[in-house]
Each structure stands twice: as C-alpha cells, then as structure tokens.
C-alpha cells in the first residue's frame, strides 16, 4: 500500500523572493533493487539490468563522491556499484544537466555493472529532513540508511561498502552496522583495487585539483575577470531584452581575440539582429569556452569592432572571416554562462624549457589543448617530464574570476605525438566518440550464423512477408569494399505495361528490439563513424556485415517501398510499403555499374555473379541487368528533373579518398570522381525517404522523425555573389529555385572549376540539415531547402544511422496501425523524440568532423615524408577562390585540398614574380580589393592575383607539437602548373544543367503528348537512355559530410 508524504521545496523567483511549494510524495513498500540476491524479485519488479552475481561486495558512493569522482566510477573494473536516487538528484541540482546525463548514460550502459536504487520512494529507506538539518548531512544520512536497508534486504549475504568524503560520517557510521562499511573513496581504492593504477592516478589527480581549488579560494587575488551575474538576473535580462542568449563559437584562426555568439532560442527572434555577435578579446569572453551557452550584453555602437580579414596562422578553409575590419558589426561581452560545454580535452605538455619558464612551482603546469579554440589549462601533476612526448586527456574542474586560465586535472594517456593510433585516438576524444567493444550482454542478444548453425528464414516470416526472391531482379550498387549494404533496387515491367520501381532496405528492426541492450547502445552511438582508414560500427558485425547486409545470393529480410509508375511519363500511380524477403542477384560496384550503363560490357569479367556462367546464360543475364540499370537511370533523371523544377540544388563538396596499401601506408590521395550512377542510386533513395516521410507524418503527425533543411541567411551569400560578379555572373539567392538556376548558368567554358568553386561557396553558405520531431514545429518548417521537398526523412540506412531505425519503427507502426497496438507503445513521445533528435544531430556533427579531421591527418602524412623542394607530387595547380588582406585561399583539384597561401611572410616581405612566373620574397606592400590583390615591391615591380586565377603551388606540411599538423601552401609561380583542370574538363560532353534541362523538357513533352493522346518523341527518349557522357553530378554523399544534401546511402569503406 502506498504511503503519502508531503515534500516541501523552497524555490527562488526572478525577483529574489523565496517560494514555498508543497508536493505529494508517495512511498512504496518495494522498488526495483536490481540485485540477483533479491529474495522477492517479483515484488521488487527487477525487470531491468541486474548487478553481477560474482562480485565480492556492493559499493554505494555518497552524493559527494558521485559528484567529484564519477569519472573514476566509470571504470568498467569497478563492479557492483549502486547509485542512490539521493546522490543522483544531488548531481542533477548541483552539477547541472551535462553531468547528470553522463550519470544516466552510465546507468544505461550494459558494459558497466551499476544500477540505480530509488531509495527516496522506498518506505523503509526514505528519511524526512529534520528541522535545521543541512542538506549535505541529510543526503549522507539518507544514503547510509538506504545502504543498511539494502544489506538486510539481500539477507545479509553481500557486504556493503559506502564510500564518502565526509570524515564525520566515517567516524559516526564506520562500525555502526555489521556488514556495512563506511570508508573514504581513496581508502576504498587502496584496499579493494590496489592494482588499478589508472584509477589511482585519476583519483589522485582529482583530489589534488580539488585541494588546490580550496586553497586558492581562501587566498585573496586580484580579479582577472568580472564575476558572472546571478542566474535570476540573467533570465530576467533575457526576458526583458537587455541581454541576449547564444552559443559561443571561437574562431580557431584567431582563438585568442575573436569569438562569435550565434543567437539561440528566443533571442534569435526577439533581438532583431541578423548577424552573429562579435566577442573581441579574452576579457570580453569572460571565462566562457567554445560551445558554452552564454548570455551577452551588447556594447554601444561606438565600441563595435569588425572581423579581421587577414589570414591567420592556421587558416585552411572557407570559414575564415571575409569582412573588412573597417565594417563594424554587433559587438558584446559575456556577462554569464547558462550551460557549460566542458568535455574531455586532448592536450600536450610543454617542453622542458617551457616548464622551467612557467615558474618555481613545477607541479602546476599549463598544458596546451589540441583544439586551438580551447584556452590553456592549468593542471597539477608530477609526470610532466615523463609525458612530454604524449597526447593526454584532461578535464576542466573550474575557472575562477581570479585565474587567467581554467583549472583541470589529468585523466589518461592517449599515445605518442605523431603516432597514427595516438592521433586517431585524439580525433575520437575531441569529438566525444566512444569506440569500446560491444558488451557480452549486447552480443547475447544477437542471432547466430555459423557454418555449424547457419541462419535461415523462419517459416513464420515467410508467411507474413511478401516474397520477392523469385519474382524480382534485386541488386545493389555500392562503393568497392563495402560490407554494410543497406539498400538494394529493383525495376520490372508489370502485366499492364507499367513499371514497378522498388527500393529494398535492410530490416534492422527485426533483429534490434526496442529498448534492448543493443538498441540502447545503437541509440547512444547514433551513427557509424567513418574515418579515412577505418570505421566504427553502430551495430555489431553479425548484423552490419552479415545478417542485415543485403549481400548477393543470400536470403535477407527487408523493408520495401515499391511504386507503380506510368510506362512513359514515370508518374507514380500507387505505392506499397511492407516487409519482404529478398535475394540480391548482384553486388555491383559503382564503377562496374557505370561501365555497363556506358555500354562497356568487357567489365563482365569483374562481376562474379556473371563470370561463372556459360556464354548463353551470361548474355541473357547481362541483357536483363543492363536493361534494369538503364531503366533505373532514366527514371532517376526524370525524378531529378521534377525536383529541379521545384528548386533542388546541386552543390559542391570536396571528398578525398585515401588509397592505402596492405600495410596501411598511403599510396595516393584521390578526389572522388562523380558518376551518373551515383545520382541514379541517390535519386531512388531520396524518393523512398520522401514517400516514407509522408507516410509516417500522416499516421503520426505529432511524433514522426523528419529531417528539415532551413533556408540560409541571405547575408551568408555575400561572398558567393561577389565572387560570381568577378566573372560576370549574377547569382540570385532569393529562393532555392533562383539559386539553382543561377548556378547552372554560371559556367565558364574555359574553366569548369569556376562553377565547381561557386557551388562550393554556396554549400558553405547553407545552414545545417537537422532531425526533428513533427510535434515540435509548424508544418511550414518541415521543408528541405536543398532537396526542394516538403517532407523528408532518413529511411534508407538503418545499419549505420539510428534515425533510420526510429523511422522503420514508425513506418511499421503506420502500416500495422490497426493490427498490433504493442508496436505503437514502443514509439517515442514528441518530447522524448525531440531530445533524441538533438542527440543524433550532435553525433552526426561529430561524425562529420572526425571524418574531415582524419582525412586531413592522412593528407599531412602523405606529404610529410616528401621533400617539397624536389618531389614532383608536391607541386600542383591551384585556383584562387578567396582574397584576404595578406594572402589568398587556394583550392588544389588534384588532391582536393583547400588552404591558405601567404603573399606577405612573417618578415613583412611580399611575393614577387618574374617574367617566367617564378616567385621570390622582396620588401614591398600589398593592396587588396574585392576581387584581386596586388603585390608591389619597393623597386616598383607588381604582380596581381585575381579570383579564379590558376597558380602553381608547393605543398608542404607545417608540423605542430601541440596541435594537428597542417598543409602549408606556397605560391611558386603565378602561372598554371598544367592545363587547368585537365582531368575534369573532358568528363562530359553534356553539363549536368544541360542534361537536366533536356530531361525536364522531355517530361513536359511526354505529359503533353499523353494528354492529347499523341505520340511520344522516341528520339529524345533514346538520346537520354543511350548517353555515354558522365554527368557533373556531385555526390550527395559529399554533401552529407557538409550536413546538407545528406542522402548518402553508400558506405565510405
């Protein structure tokens, strides 16, 4: 029977008054104890994760230990850990949401032997707070009382160790109850885990850092920064419009002096500002760190400053500032921090000389973070000399107003500086990517497929699914080496003469049950992480590379979308969704499919499924396959043409494939070449994603997971418009349709790279595409700007995207709505779905960053061991795509590299080019305008560099001990190194824009002809089916890396 208590809460209002709130608090005779020793498991309802049976004791940390030593408690070696509800709530209220979510994720993680015990809802454990009792004392008393009850509940069969930092509690409770021991956390590690050195080192580091904070708080220092305003003042200021809330973004090229606040939440609508707010200098930043949610006070207009237009020390991309410092922009200062974005940071210790120069107390060391945007961190350690050559992980503990730098503590060693595995580990830590192996509990949920016990289609599934194994020619088209084949395609002619197009996606949800251990793990990872030389899977390989991978010649479960199309206009007549059984006939690579599409049948020997056949059978199968690929391509052209009429964008990204040998040595860097078959596959995937989005929204209008791409801010197009103007083109950015048409017409027949770079600039101006719950925003906000679709989602890659798993469950619930009510019960509510979307969006950004950073790592490794002065491959043709006050930004097509090239060096010498084009450094000056920069020597010689000029550059590597190595570009001649862009010039006799216009006209004519029952123009149809030219289609997979046209449904390895 429930017992009712009254719980009194004292809350402070914005006006500073104390508000007394009384809430009902119900106590239960039993709550889940999650112990295998429970004498009444049915009464306790122990349905979730249980503690391990083989432990020698249970450990219960008090609230203070959970707050200060949570990262030690995360060690998987520490087993039998029971987190009391009282301790968890203390973390939530005193350490904020970030630390609390970290604790929640630890409790969910099947790899960690820890559970939550809701002691404040258990009638024998709950203790009311006594009058005048300090909160900290009540929390410790409550946790101890719960520990005693838990010991007796397990029938005194398992000793309990309560760890606390409260010396008074140790003295009071230490020997009060037999079987319940109360000791300090340090004492616990010394006695129970003496050989767990990493835990001891981390504990010592945290303890030392805490003691120093306490000592410093007692000392009087001058204030380095102003104090942050109280929370109630900040919230009232935001509400009144005096202050503005936003996310701090530090400019990595000028991390010491330049940061921007991107408006967040209501501030973005109420402030009236159309640009970011400049935060100039570290004082104005006021101890906020990149990614923090901050509150800003605007400065008077007379104090506004402008961005710097000069190249910084590590400029390497398009994100460098482009505005002149003479153009002031809204400027402010940080007055408070609403949410800290502190995380693990990879740092490097200073050299011996630097340590000596830091002062007499050598135990306090300033370490330099790998990320330029993070300030130096002061830590205390005696290992500085031993760790000078290593990358290590630290965490920030505090940043007081009296300290120039934040204080932190040492966590662990990653690896040696420059070592490949150490640098990869750095990228993973910097992006908060965990790559630990799947746990035993998770693997126990997996199906078995071994030679002794092969997996088979079950009779039940054969009855419930549509069987396509003998009726449909199903095949996949993927990159070479792809193992996780998410999608397959089919096309066939129906008895009524119409066509049937099918997209068949791996049925991952059949094997991954909602809220199972593997489902929780996949949700946490959210995506498969693809690096330049490896990948980290979201799902175990038994699923990702075997039973869910739609490999050739084996039976697989799929979720299919199949459309009936008009045989001439390809108009969709009807659509079917459902679960199927397929057997893929071919596992084609993109290159082989393109060769077949182009009529090169000699590629047959590279297709294993055809190679083993006799000539007659081979010819028949080949004709069937070629027809299917050709028909799919023709359908895809018409689908794309229809989207183009609505304003779909074809943008440009840079993707480089790292070619490795068997020993993982880098053989070459190869920019990915677009093929028309890429577009064919992508268009089919876009079609499936669009139709599934419509279906799940119709069925669940308030809790469907869709993907939106908001229109970009017009001011972000300024550089694109100016650059196009330099070549005589006008870019109309009023809508996606006008932008697409303008980019299609901005072609320089002498240099195709001009259009490529303009599209790349358009990509940089775009906002990010994001997942969202349909119950969280208005329908007019669902639109996908880049794809020109009113509703869009991700359905086609459930092996490597958790969003697709959610969408599959929604689709199954939609088509089974009246049949299986239990399916609906496993769907997320709007609130929970929106929280999940934020998590997935965050993990997607991490995946994109890590992929980009790993590619840059391998680019540097490729050039690092080469002599830039003599090696031919270190000299390349480059195109200037942006002008700065002291140099230019250059794109190198051969290697897909973008970077800065200085025209003025550190000695203030400027570049001078002779009649042959060769360069040298001389005294002089630079004069910059919008579209060109002139270098004039003291002797009067001048050289002009224009936008889109081709120059010869030397590629070398700028080594860095504390940060990642970077590519260094040096202009060695103002002449092209070779015929500009030879490799790309002759790719196609038809530009993509021309092809789409022709196909659009074909569709319109076919529709008109059908209306008047006229004759279809067969000549044009034949032209499109038989074209051998490669389109200039830019891979949608590339755009995924830029979080825009993210329809990539192929793997990167």
UniProtKB/Swiss-Prot annotation:
Residues 465-816 form the RNB domain. Its main location: cytoplasm. The keyword Translocase does not apply. It is found in: Cytoplasm. Its EC number is 3.1.13.1. PROSITE patterns: RIBONUCLEASE_II. Keywords: Cytoplasm, Exonuclease, Exosome, Hydrolase, Magnesium, Nuclease, Phosphoprotein, RNA-binding. This is DIS3-like exonuclease 1.
